[in-house]
Design a protein with these regions (language model features):
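Extracellular, repeat-based ectodomains that mediate carbohydrate processing or recognition
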Residues: 1-253
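A short beta-strand micro-motif common to beta-rich folds, especially ectodomain repeats
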Residues: 286-298
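Hydrophobic beta-strand positions in extracellular immunoglobulin-like domains
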Residues: 249, 282, 295-297
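Proline-enriched interdomain boundary motifs that mark the N-terminal boundary
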Residues: 313-317
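C-terminal edge beta-strand
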Residues: 300-312
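Strand-loop-strand motifs at the edges of beta-sheets in extracellular beta-sandwich domains
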Residues: 267-282
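Short, solvent-exposed loop/linker segments at beta-strand-coil boundaries, enriched for Pro/Gly
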Residues: 258-270
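Conserved glycine-centered beta-strand/turn positions repeated across beta-sheet architectures
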Residues: 259, 278-282, 287
């Protein structure tokens, strides 16, 4: 699902017929921003999106055999940053941002009709929402807290909504994406705007642990996370420095698949996690230090060492 900038419509593309077919689903005004898509057990399509013209949260589905669009929440300027998920009973769950009140909101039809809830009203919260369901159909939502510049997380797994600040370092939580593994452990990727890093948070150890997993340049915007059948983590994201799409994988123990270095390289140098190349220009003096480069894939790991010293040299002509 996507927004058609020229016609201001919600569009949908699929290759289920064997070739790509595109359809204009909603053409009633300026519609289709912040779109999110999910598929139910019958392979019917469900899409949440923002209606700019009417400032509403809208929803589209083809489960009846043809496309039907519905205004779900019309109370103020609502429906930004939508994310949609389908539970084991094919009920729909949508998280989104209420721009009028600055709140994280949630809508579901699991009772048979749409019920709307304000989950977090503590400041300006709910930007960049991402939703996922666990094996019990409990809801998990990651989002950005604009007031405190934090990554936040909300869940109803205890029977009522509980919100938690996961990462409280400066300017983190942008473009969050959430997924759950086979043990219902939570995994969140997000962008650290202050440092320009891709960050990753998980509670699989029993408490939240956050890690900067790519620090090579300005990386981590527009992140998306997925978990495979072996509980390995897969994350896609933007490399703003090189204008590239990047990918990083972590095994089920949260070890980065690819290259890593320990300790941190001298200021101004960075390691390309895909190629193992060290590049950059040192910006500070550094004593003679040995760095361990580790490369890891599904077959195992290997290491090598490199020694780097940064001295203050007299300029030459």
């Amino acid at each position: 699902s996507y927004y058609h900038e020229t016609n201001k419509d919600l569009k949908y593309a699929t290759d289920k017929s064997g070739s790509w077919v595109t359809t204009s689903i909603d053409t009633s005004g300026i519609v289709g921003h912040y779109t999110s898509i999910a598929i139910d057990s019958n392979d019917d399509v469900h899409i949440s999106y923002y209606d700019v013209t009417n400032a509403e949260l809208k929803y589209a589905t083809d489960k009846s055999g043809s496309w039907v669009t519905t205004s779900i929440d019309t109370s103020g300027n609502v429906g930004y940053h939508t994310s949609i998920a389908i539970d084991s009973n094919d009920a729909v769950h949508i998280s989104y941002y209420d721009n009028t009140n600055g709140d994280l909101k949630y809508a579901t039809d699991k009772s048979g009709s749409w019920v709307i809830t304000s989950i977090d009203t503590s400041g300006i919260v709910g930007i960049d929402t991402s939703i996922a369901l666990d094996s019990n159909d409990d809801v998990h939502i990651s989002y950005y807290d604009y007031t405190n510049d934090d990554l936040k997380y909300a869940t109803d797994k205890s029977g009522s909504w509980v919100t938690t600040s996961i990462d409280t370092s400066l300017y983190v939580g942008y473009y969050s994406s959430i997924a759950l593994d086979s043990n219902d452990d939570v995994h969140i990727s997000h962008y650290d705007l202050y440092n320009g890093d891709l960050k990753y948070a998980t509670d699989k150890s029993g408490s939240w642990v956050t890690t900067s997993i790519d620090t090579s340049g300005n990386v981590g915007a527009y992140t998306s996370i997925g978990i495979d059948s072996n509980d390995a983590v897969h994350i896609s994201y933007r490399d703003t420095t090189d204008n590239e799409l990047k990918y990083i994988g972590l095994d089920s123990s949260s070890n980065v698949l690819g290259y890593s270095v320990s300790p941190d390289l001298p200021a101004g140098l960075s390691l390309n996690i895909a190629t193992g190349e060290i590049s950059g220009t040192p910006t500070a003096l550094s004593i003679n230090t040995t760095y361990t480069i580790t490369v890891r894939n599904s077959g195992g790991t290997n290491t090598t060492t490199v020694t780097i010293v940064v001295n203050d040299e007299i300029p030459s002509f």
